[in-house]
Amino acid sequence: MLSSKRPVRTLIAAALALAALPAMAADPAFNRTVFFGDSLTDSGYFRPLLPPSVQPVTGKFTTNPAWVWAEHVADYYGTNATPNGNGQSGDNYAAGGATVATDLVGALGPTPSLKTQAARYLAANGGKADGNALYTVWGGPNDLFGITNPAQAPAVIGAAVTNQIGIVGSLQAAGAKYVMVPNLPDIGLTPMARAGGPAAMAQYTAVATAYNNALYGGLTQAGIEFIPLDTFTILREIVASPTTYGFRNVTDMACTSASSVTCNPTSLVAPDAATAYVFADGVHPSAATHQMLGQYAVSVLEAPRLQQVLTHSAQTIGHSRADQVSLHLGGAPADGLSWWGGVRGDMQRYDHADLYDGLAPAGLFGIDWARDGMVVGGFAGYGRMDADFGNSQGDFTQSDTTVGLFAGWYGERAWVNGQVSYSWLDYDVTRKVHLGPATREHKGSPEGSNLTAALNAGYEFGQEGSFRHGPVAAVIWQKVKLDGYLESNPSSTALGYSDQDADSTVGRLGWQARLDGGSIKPYVQVTYDHEFEDRQDGSAFLQSLPGVGSYRVPGLKFDKDYATAILGARMELFGLQSNIGLSATTMQKKAMDTSIFASFSGAF
């Protein structure tokens, strides 16, 4: 005859095996990065036309062989920013010297405009754009450089802006959802402009400003959604405080060659010029400046997603709290008034902590009144989470104060209980933006709430000695609200956020087993959990561009299907009824939520 303990041992072993499986969290925001632009984005369009002997250390308009900003962005997302053109087939179509809409023939050969670049991309992809890709359309400087008379400026700017808006519109019409449109940097700060004196500097600043206002104003008026990038302001900030960012020269060129396309380590004005100078030549950024532009772009793209960590962490804590409330009774209680209290330690770790990880101790206290298997009661609790965003992107604390109601019915074999609770959420958030050797901190203290409702039920089949087992089911619904707020330290990297609503509806089906005899009564529950709500895009707005409005990026994508294993034991401890256990989610990708809990109860 089989021991009655063997089935529960088997289920416990299965639960432990599930908990040991590796898990995954949020996927990268974009599956592809496609760039259209000029020399500011060009990652080597003309390199095949240069002498083979120098190709490894030339071909970009910077302090070669450094990366341009687009390559830094692509590297972050694990995508492609290699050149497309002159026999190359990457996703960076940008070509040095390109205007917005007019194809040219330059010193290095034919130069396709941004309009032609985008048309070639669409033609190569069946006229369709990838809705999960990031597109960048950055142009305009070469159109401005073609102005020979100030009177031409309005017409030139108007034509270029109209065509650039048309490019963005055509990409979105083809299916693109996320198009980044950087504005022009302050050309008046370049060595080329400085060579013309204060009047030339002012003139170039004025035309860049006019272009930027027309571009963003036109996109907004046309109702076209886009992701802005304020390169105009960030370049000003770098030039205004060069030592903060590791520079010692903001006025001169790092390269001795006439054009940075042939600049290489042997043609620098100093061995460290690639990192000590802001500009490579008369108009193009150095290696260090490109790195900072890439870091800036990534910060703008990722910050809205970090805000979704705040709502997700609240939902995860709410889930653990709902489980603890549901499990505080192991069966029909004695008639009368009783109390219960519990402590819990939640650990959240996502993407091996590259997304975020944190610890959240919490406490609960409740009072129940029971008669003939019916139970009603209330509870209250408090918890605090200290967490770090991954990749040194900052940290946050989250506190929750909760009140709730509980009701249940416990029969000989079946049981059902329900609860509803409301939590007041308070956050202190620090987001860090790394720009070369400098780190900016932006802080905020938003408030929020979590309305939770849960229904749990189970049934136990016959009895084999002291062994009981049967199916369980549950639904946990949560609505988390996060108030909008403005980050501190207003600058090009500071963002603002509108109110967020994050809904979660988790359905759960599984099996439970327990041993009812003896002084220690172990139990195990293993369930398949499914999240019914779809992810939402993240959104934010740049404080330095108040008239542009909010932009959207893909939201964090958490697993919709996973397993939860709960292992515990009920016993009498210090004269009190006790429930001590561990809960862990698994079968996720690079993610695990773990909770250690202990509850105690007694009669009044």
Describe the residue ranges of each PLM region.
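Transmembrane beta-barrel strand/turn architecture of Gram-negative outer membrane proteins
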Residues: 211-215, 397-405, 453-455, 504-514
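Short beta-strand segments
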Residues: 35, 94, 136-140, 342, ...
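Outer membrane beta-barrel translocator domains of Type V secretion systems
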Residues: 308-469, 477, 581-595, 599-603
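Gram-negative bacterial Sec-dependent N-terminal signal peptides
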Residues: 1-27, 407
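Outer membrane beta-barrel transmembrane domains
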Residues: 339, 404, 408, 497-604
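Conserved active-site regions of diverse hydrolases
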Residues: 25-336, 343-351, 572
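Solvent-exposed, glycine/polar-rich loop segments of beta-barrel outer-membrane systems
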Residues: 150-154, 191-204, 244-258, 262, ...
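Short, structured loop/turn "capping" segments at alpha-beta junctions
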Residues: 464-470, 480-484, 518-522
